[in-house]
């Protein structure tokens, strides 16, 4: 039986903002606000670039990631387009 390929929403979201170099605001669980562009990520951390400097941010410390512009993660279904 072939394995069904599924992607989790976190990876789809982070990949979209990485590929599109979308500016983001990241809020950490301690309230600190970081801003920049996500250049890389894995299961545990991401790299955030701003003004030529790169920060390694651990995902367990992140509360919220807010892109500066709207993000469309999935193609709309035929029913959604016709509505």
UniProtKB/Swiss-Prot annotation:
One of its GO terms (biological process) is regulation of translation, ncRNA-mediated. GO terms for molecular function: RNA binding. Belongs to the Hfq family. This is RNA-binding protein Hfq. SUPFAM superfamilies: Sm-like ribonucleoproteins. The keyword RNA-binding applies. RNA chaperone that binds small regulatory RNA (sRNAs) and mRNAs to facilitate mRNA translational regulation in response to envelope stress, environmental stress and changes in metabolite concentrations. Also binds with high specificity to tRNAs.
């Amino acid at each position: 039986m072939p394995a069904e390929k599924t992607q989790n929403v976190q990876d789809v979201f982070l990949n979209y903002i990485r590929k599109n170099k979308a500016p983001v605001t990241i809020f950490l669980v301690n309230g600190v606000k970081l801003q920049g562009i996500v250049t890389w990520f894995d299961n545990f951390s991401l790299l955030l670039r701003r003004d030529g400097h790169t920060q390694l941010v651990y995902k367990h410390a992140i509360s919220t990631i807010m892109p500066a512009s709207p993000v469309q993660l999935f193609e709309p279904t035929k029913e959604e387009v016709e509505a």
